[in-house]
Amino acid sequence: SACVAWSGEHGNTRRRFYDPERGYFRTTRICSFTRMEALQHEMIDIINNLPDYTKVGLASFSTSGYRNNKVWEDSRNELAELGPSNSETRQSAIRFVNSLSNSDPKYWGGTMPWDTLDAAFSDRLTDTIYFLSDGKPNKDRDGFTWSSNDYDSVADHYAALNASRVSDGDKSIKLNTTSVGLNSEWMQLLSSKTSGEYIRVDDI
């Protein structure tokens, strides 16, 4: 995973990290916390603060075939009601989020959110999406190399899905985005066109 903050100290072993500009590398520098840890902290905070009656679905988006391309079993078939803070359902949701860092980062996969977002927009009960990411997509919606030319088309696509939902008598979806460890212009645009909020998280 990418390191958000380095401690300034060095350890005895070399660990593997990711840099968006140079790819994967190994170093003895000690990382205070990674983007994945910041993302998990933010998501768990969201889960802990949702009302008991909230029905949620959780999914992590990644490259097909990789370990972090998965859904939370409790919401595989339908949204699950969280219940009280000590409920098994809420604790299961937190365990799912924590499981995202269980393996070596090389097995996590890339950033491919389209199928997951489309599935969320097709659920008639969904009214809010919390979309967290620590990187830019590997490919655009058509499978081509991601570029700044995709920013508007992606935001327009989900704005159009919202318009279709309203015309079908469903609620529009508020898409809140959280960018972890970097500024994300395309996520800002995505939220602005779906009445959501964009935030950037740099620490835990």
For the regions a language model picked out, list residue spans one by one.
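Structured segments of extracytoplasmic/periplasmic soluble domains
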Residues: 42-53, 61-64, 96-103, 119-123, ...
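Secretory-pathway/luminal and periplasmic proteins that interact with or process carbohydrate-rich
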Residues: 65-70
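Alpha-helix capping and helix-coil boundary motifs
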Residues: 34, 75, 89, 149-154, ...
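VWA/integrin I-like adhesion module and closely mimicked acidic/polar interface patches used
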Residues: 7-10, 103-105, 135-201
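…and closely analogous acidic/polar surface helices at protein-protein or active-site interfaces
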Residues: 2-58, 81-89, 101-111
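A general structural motif
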Residues: 53, 126, 170-172
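DG-centered beta-turn motif at the end of beta-strands
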Residues: 1, 39, 58-61, 120, ...
